[in-house]
UniProtKB/Swiss-Prot annotation:
The APC/C is composed of at least 13 subunits that stay tightly associated throughout the cell cycle: APC1, APC2, APC4, APC5, APC9, APC11, CDC16, CDC23, CDC26, CDC27, DOC1, MND2 and SWM1. MND2 interacts directly with APC1, APC5 and CDC23. GO terms for molecular function: ubiquitin ligase inhibitor activity. GO terms for cellular component: anaphase-promoting complex; nucleus. Residues 140-167, 286-336 are annotated as: Disordered. Belongs to the APC15 family. The keyword Phosphoprotein applies. It comes from the Eukaryota. One of its GO terms (biological process) is mitotic sister chromatid segregation. This is Anaphase-promoting complex subunit MND2. Residues 149-162 have a biased composition (Basic and acidic residues). The lineage of its organism: Eukaryota, Fungi, Dikarya, Ascomycota, Saccharomycotina. Component of the anaphase promoting complex/cyclosome (APC/C), a cell cycle-regulated E3 ubiquitin-protein ligase complex that controls progression through mitosis and the G1 phase of the cell cycle. The APC/C is thought to confer substrate specificity and, in the presence of ubiquitin-conjugating E2 enzymes, it catalyzes the formation of protein-ubiquitin conjugates that are subsequently degraded by the 26S proteasome. Disulfide bonds: none annotated. It comes from Saccharomyces cerevisiae (strain ATCC 204508 / S288c) (Baker's yeast). The keyword Cell cycle applies.
Length: 368
């Protein structure tokens, strides 16, 4: 075919004109491009031949056109017709007229949206579907901006109580207000609370609460709680006698009543009474449940000749010495030596307990 074209004189004339103008029909493949690239890398530059640059520019400037499909130009469908109700049938058979009318009715709404999401008008380069989506987004953004402006204005009214006309005065809500009249400077009028007034009340209350919290913190800092526990007064001394004192004398009396810290860590009167009870339980001549007993375990002695605790007739007639004059039985009898040894061992054990408690108290004071 190329030979046949060359035989035509008109074709040869057009070809000569194009060659003389320098417009050559350029066609490159990957092999030609690689060879041109290698020539540039090796330093062999052909400044006269710029066909490669023009080819690259033409490739980059080529824009792919948007071509809609053929279905975008019509609303017909090739799907078979299925009757959806008994009214579309005539005596149980398919009526061709009803079929065509139903297809025509279903085609009308499709014609209205022909090219809705396919056609892009010249100069807009967007489909109708894309334009509608942009409009909906713009409406949503405008609504959000209006809401933010309203919220900011509302906050500014809350922060500035002067907008409500209440400076330095707290206005109660309308429900809590009594039928009173206040002078606002413009005349004697009754104040009625509005939503803005209630917001101003909340702002003033929050400021007052913050001031009260600062004052309470200052009071807590100025008050020394440790000083409350530095001076401990013995309750027994207060009950025995209270000496009224004023000025320096009263301070000296209070200082005398201060109990040292060592006494606080020592065994209490309850522990001493228990020790006394344990010690007196082993005495043969004392009753451990006797409240009037002043025996502290230091000068106690076993007296077998006389027992002053029992002064009744039965006690006088009974000979207590006869119990200890007998020899100890095989199953174990309490002799004076055994009682004294037991008493001494108990006293030593109690003193060791006191020392242990004092040692622990010293350790605790050292840790504190």
């Amino acid at each position: 075919m190329a030979r046949a074209l060359r035989d035509i004189s008109l074709f040869n004339d057009i070809r000569k004109d194009q060659n003389s103008a320098g417009a050559k029909h350029e066609r490159y493949n990957m092999r030609d491009l690689r060879s041109k690239k290698n020539q540039h890398v090796n330093g062999i530059d052909d400044y006269e031949d710029d066909s490669l640059d023009r080819f690259i520019r033409r490739k980059k400037s080529r824009v792919v056109k948007y071509i809609p499909s053929l279905s975008a130009y019509n609303v017909f469908n090739e799907f078979p017709y299925y009757p959806t109700s008994a009214s579309q049938l005539l005596d149980g058979k398919l009526d061709e007229f009803l079929m065509l009318s139903e297809q025509y009715k279903s085609r009308l709404p499709k014609i209205r949206k022909l090219g809705w999401n396919r056609f892009k008008p010249i100069g807009i380069n967007k489909t109708m579907y894309e334009l509608e989506m942009l409009r909906s987004r713009a409406r949503a953004q405008n609504a959000e901006g209006n809401n933010e402006e309203d919220f900011r204005q509302h906050d500014s009214r809350e922060e500035d109580p002067r907008n409500n006309g209440s400076i330095g005065r707290v206005i109660l809500p309308h429900i809590l207000q009594e039928n009173e009249e206040y002078d606002t400077g413009e005349g004697v009028t009754g104040l009625h609370s509005m939503p803005n007034d209630s917001m101003a009340i909340l702002a003033n209350n929050s400021a007052n609460n913050s001031q009260n919290e600062e004052v309470s913190e200052e009071d807590e800092i100025s008050y020394d709680y440790d000083a409350e526990f530095d001076h401990v007064v013995d309750e027994d001394d207060n009950e025995e006698g209270e000496v009224p004192g004023e000025g320096v004398e009263g301070i000296e009396v209070q200082r005398e009543r201060i109990v040292p810290d060592d006494l606080l860590m020592r065994p209490t009167s309850l522990s001493r009474s228990l020790q006394q009870f344990v010690e007196e339980a082993h005495h043969l001549d004392r009753n451990p449940y006797d409240i009037d007993s002043d025996n502290d375990g230091e000068d106690s002695k076993v007296e077998l000749d006389m027992n002053p605790d029992f002064e009744d007739d039965v006690g006088r007639e009974h000979d207590y010495n006869s119990e200890y004059s007998q020899e100890p039985t095989s199953y174990g009898g309490i002799t004076p030596d055994l009682a004294s040894n037991w008493r001494n061992w108990t006293r030593e054990r109690i003193t060791s307990l006191d020392e242990l408690m004092e040692r622990r108290a010293r350790q605790q004071r050292g840790q504190d």
